[in-house]
Regions:
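Single-stranded RNA-binding regions, centering on S1/OB-family and related RNA-binding modules
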Residues: 1-182
């Protein structure tokens, strides 16, 4: 391959016994100098997916999250829906920013699945990720399915990040769920 299409796989990442010409699956991302780097490690999430990651550091440009690779993942301030602290677990989605870098966002609504396996009456666990006076409490069931405690039902004390025991009260045609904690 020409130099433009080459990607570095650091020698410590090369599996023992690998020979030139062997093929392998790698994950490619940009390092802090914007160079493409390959790794044989699997990150905790791929582009468009959601996952709960631990905040490893908070800096002046945002928070950094442990996502299973050597270089932590940036959660920019403008993608945070609330202030995060070191050591906290946060639900995020992975996206590609304007400069073609991988970043995290806490604005996960559009990344959550509407293909729920649950039916009315099922008991589920959900993580609060957003609270709206108009709509209610937005919850990610199993950290991946879209659900809502409608405003008329939302009577408890809710805060983003809190995990609730819920019951499915409705599954709409579009696959989104209404849930209740009553």
């Amino acid at each position: 391959a020409d130099a433009k299409n080459r990607v570095l796989l650091p020698s410590k990442q090369v599996p023992e016994g690998t020979k030139e010409g062997d093929s392998m699956e790698v994950f490619i991302y940009k390092d802090s100098q914007d160079r493409l780097i390959a790794t044989t490690k699997e990150p905790k999430l791929q582009v468009g997916q959601t996952a709960v990651l631990k905040v490893s550091q908070v800096t002046r440009i945002g928070a950094f999250l442990d996502w299973g690779l050597e270089k932590d993942l940036l959660l920019p301030y403008h993608e945070q829906t609330l202030k995060v602290r070191e050591g906290e677990d946060v639900l995020v989605a992975l996206y590609i920013d304007k400069s073609s870098r991988l970043c995290a966002t806490m604005k996960v609504y559009h990344y959550l699945s509407t293909r729920t396996p649950y039916v009315v009456g099922d008991m589920v666990k959900g993580r609060v990720y957003e609270i709206s006076d108009r709509f209610g409490v937005f919850v990610a069931v199993d950290d991946k399915y879209s659900a809502l405690i409608p405003a008329r039902e939302a009577k408890g004390k809710y805060r983003p990040g809190k995990i609730l025991e819920l019951r499915v009260s409705e599954v709409k045609e579009d696959g989104k769920m209404n849930v209740t904690d009553r």
